Regions:
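Short acidic-glycine-tyrosine-enriched beta hairpin
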Residues: 40-57
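Double-stranded beta-helix
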Residues: 61, 65-107
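A short glycine-rich, His/Asp/Glu-containing loop-to-beta-strand
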Residues: 1-18, 24
Length: 107
């Protein structure tokens, strides 16, 4: 099982909070424009045709930010999240079908 999302990111927008999944692989392909990929190890530009993969269980928080003056477009492949999702920059965890604080208590 997997899903595909077609995403148009407006200038100044981010794809999400930086995150990583315990049980979901993610793969993205840039279609148009330029986005900045922000990961644990730094930042890099993605241009049309560039790809990025995020293996499940690897604690590499990531997201895309559009720091350009025009829209950027990409597709991301993954499966519906069933496991935990971690957000390293904020006090947030998706676990057991609920939003929780990093230490496990519910919001």
């Amino acid at each position: 099982d997997f899903g595909v999302s077609h995403v148009v990111l407006k200038p100044g927008a981010a794809s999400s909070q930086r995150h990583w999944h315990e049980d979901e692989d993610e793969f993205l392909v840039m279609l148009a424009g330029i986005a900045t990929l922000v990961e644990e190890d730094g930042r890099s530009l993605l241009r049309p045709g560039d790809m990025a993969a995020f293996p499940k269980g690897e604690p590499n928080g990531h997201h895309l930010v559009n720091e350009s003056d025009s829209d950027c477009t990409f597709v991301v492949f993954g499966r519906p999240p069933t496991g935990d999702c971690h957000y390293p920059d904020i006090d947030l965890l998706w676990s057991g079908g609920m939003w929780r604080h990093k230490e496990g208590s519910s919001y």
